[in-house]
Design a protein with these regions (language model features):
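Short, solvent-exposed mixed-charge patches
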Residues: 139-140
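Residue-level recognition of beta-strand termini and adjacent short loop/turns
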Residues: 105-107
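Exposed beta-sheet edge/beta-hairpin loop segments within beta-rich domains
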Residues: 101-102
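Sec-dependent N-terminal signal peptides
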Residues: 3-12
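Central antiparallel beta-sheet cores of small beta-barrel/beta-sandwich binding domains
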Residues: 17-98, 122-135
Length: 140
């Protein structure tokens, strides 16, 4: 019975949601502009996200100005864990914004905005640089 119990504990700890569980933030000059919170779901991690209304990046795609994340988080939609990447959507009015969350290590991750080809074309036409993934840190 003991080998079974040890194997079960190993299986539970290997589930992706357990590594993600908790709060993750991205900060710029003391301002938290992205906040995510994860918990285990039945088939995939579940969570909420809040993000600042304005995030500006320099020509290289690095954040150089950001407003604080909303104090009211939005529930993640359509969460999918695939090959070490959690993809999800956030309802933004009539649109759903897509993101990918990728762990770097137990306390650091990257959050990338997933833009459609049309959004990429519009940004290029307006000579707007695309943002690099936001660097997140797990907070206690």
């Amino acid at each position: 019975m003991r080998p079974f119990a040890i194997a079960f504990v190993g299986l539970v700890l290997a589930q992706p949601g357990n590594v993600l569980n908790g709060n993750w933030t991205a900060n710029f000059q003391g301002t938290t502009y992205v906040r995510l919170a994860f918990a285990d779901g039945a088939t995939a991690p579940q969570g909420t996200m809040s993000i600042g209304q304005s995030i500006h990046v320099d020509v290289e795609g690095n954040v150089d100005n950001a407003t604080a994340a909303s104090s009211t988080p939005t529930r993640m939609l359509d969460t999918r864990w695939n090959d070490g990447v959690l993809s999800f959507g956030i309802n933004d009015g009539p649109d759903v914004d897509r993101f990918e969350f990728r762990l770097i290590d137990a306390n650091h991750a990257e959050l990338a905005m997933i833009l459609s080809e049309e959004e990429r074309r519009q940004a290029a036409a307006a000579q707007m640089p695309l943002p690099k993934p936001f660097r997140l840190t797990k907070t206690p």
